[in-house]
């Protein structure tokens, strides 16, 4: 267990995944002062970041998400210059596949991505062209595909690790194995956080702890509807998966027709997602993926990637992530002055992390984490108050599986 370096700090960030790491880094860049980064386990090791597929895409069913993704993608592309280190960005191309019933929705969402993309190409292509681009795909049942040539994936663990390294170089202090129990306040202003080993006094507290991130705010009467779901990811051998033009070549892909997602992993392996399920017991180890779950997920993917039917498994991961009712994050000041939330990313936080951290840091530094101050327009749809007000984010052109 790491000792607390500062009993007094200028800011405490709770949560050592990619969101917490990115925000801590941005706060340090802004010269906020002494920053403590707390995590109940090991930073970058046990949370949703380490179980993320790392998909990088502009395509979403809500324009708010598209705009944040478009702001984040250049950071992944220029990671070594902007952050330092290597985030593992690979430009494989991203495709979104739909059946006939969602063809019009795909055109609508692709147009929104085009609007946000600037100079980047976002195309709607037919199954025949899709097959030419990625010979490893079976295109039966696909009516249209949205194709982003500059989409792809990155390595969430590598990205988070380099963010943490950059933050530490700027003076951020890690405190591992420290559970944040409750946010402390006096007269409407944050005074710190009570942890499992004592108190850290600070005028700013950022809760970015994924599935359990909102719990320390409950003591202040702040209820954020974030529920835990178990997420799963598996890796399998597929020679040529990441070799463009090879017989087994596949893109980074979300397939609405089968409810699956997958991507290459290097040249000769691929990752695929296993559907999430509710899991609210936050105090215990997460159950590993079962043989039945893996078989079901592989069978679905084999409808699109025939070679997956016989692909040997190379590894699996499972963990918890926090999901909101509208499957969009909660970002913004809440409750007493000095409390800021960045949680509930619902399986989609990695690709948004650079933009969220940049904009959140501006609201925290320039506005003191006070609601209504230094407002960043791109974050407005994600405010904690939207659920109480009955204004969840509603997809303009929804699919069955996004």
Residue ranges and their predicted role:
Residues 5-19, 36:
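Beta1/beta-strand and adjacent pyrophosphate-binding region of the FAD-binding site
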Residues 16-17, 40, 209:
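Glycine-rich Rossmann-fold phosphate-binding loop(s) that bind the pyrophosphate
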Residues 147-203:
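Helical element adjacent to the flavin cofactor pocket in flavoenzyme catalytic cores
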Residues 28-49:
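Glycine-rich FAD pyrophosphate-binding loop
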Residues 302-402:
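C-terminal catalytic lobe of FAD-dependent flavoproteins
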Residues 25-29, 54-56, 85-93, 189, ...:
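Active-site substrate-recognition segment that forms the wall
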Residues 63, 67-70, 96-105, 146-165, ...:
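Short beta-strand to alpha-helix junction loop
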